[in-house]
From Swiss-Prot:
It holds the Pfam family RhaA. Its cofactor is Mn(2+). This is L-rhamnose isomerase. GO terms for cellular component: cytoplasm. Catalyzes the interconversion of L-rhamnose and L-rhamnulose. Its main location: cytoplasm.
Amino acid sequence: MTTQLEQAWELAKQRFAAVGIDVEEALRQLDRLPVSMHCWQGDDVAGFENPEGSLTGGIQSTGNYPGKARNATELRADLEQALRLIPGPKRLNLHAIYLESDTPVARDQIKPEHFKNWVEWAKANRLGLDFNPTCFSHPLSADGFTLSHPDAKIRQFWIDHCKASRRVSAYFGEQLGTPSVMNIWIPDGMKDITVDRLAPRQRLLEALDEVISEKFDPAHHIDAVESKLFGIGAESYTVGSNEFYMGYATSRQTALCLDAGHFHPTEVISDKISAAMLYVPRLLLHVSRPVRWDSDHVVLLDDETQAIASEIVRHNLFDRVHIGLDFFDASINRVAAWVIGTRNMKKALLRALLEPTDQLRQLEASGDYTVRLALLEEQKSLPWQAVWEMYCQRHDTPTGSQWLDSVRTYEKEILSKRS
């Protein structure tokens, strides 16, 4: 430990103690909050089923920065490089298209055995795993419908895919001793004016009920459902709207997924957390950064990321909120994207843990909004960075921007050699 870091740490402890905050306790609490990193940043959502296929479903990964992972070995190596540079507990979020098999596997036939390498790797790296059925980038999703498809055979294919995915998710939880959160997002919708908005939603309701009909131990598997406002090619109507999934999660008591980019640009998910928690048992968060639309830019340490973290901490939702990331930027170094976004999420959580929330709540209850605002602003100037650097030091990860040296070396020695 450097003398400079030690000095900054001691001063920070004193400054935060003066406002009633125990920084050691804050770091202990931070170690209770894993962040689930998304595997698809590493290869632009290509997967291993058909890596040369097109990304569909109304989502886009833009850019052509060299060095993207081309197979599972490369993707896991890239993830390991990122993991070494991020302090504290982490998880990995997988999509079904990241299966491994010597022969083609239909999506409705995926099995736990196709993900055994991921499980062994997760064990070696002390990670939990989360999962997602992949209801896009497939011939049977080409017309814009999956679980709400009017063709019963196609609809059943996607139902069976989601059911098979739940078995994979439960396998993750059994093997790793931590529940896998499996999130269902579908791209279903229409480009233009839609006459019958009810029938697709009725089909989706019935399909989801069939999907979740098999019971699993919640210690192994948790179901989540995710809404979206619109997608490219589905601008006018989205079957799985916010109202649909809020109703579904409430009535079926599944988890509800809130994606930061899946709402109108004037809406923020930080304001939805407390409302949803009154009705659903759990929330899954997809922290992202929408720029004018669901662009999935790399997460910043901005006001909304901080507000999301503050909602979790202020209301002690550690055991009911699952924090995941969802962005994919192909215009920058993909390992760096993981590191930047995940470290920013953890910084936001730390800053929230260093807030004198009880004092602020008392001021609010007494109607002293002047002091509430003043203290919230003064809080921003307290030396949280020194606490963060100590956290990095204790987890044997680089402080400040030192992690960039490791990424540059990895790019020169590994990524630059990929064609």
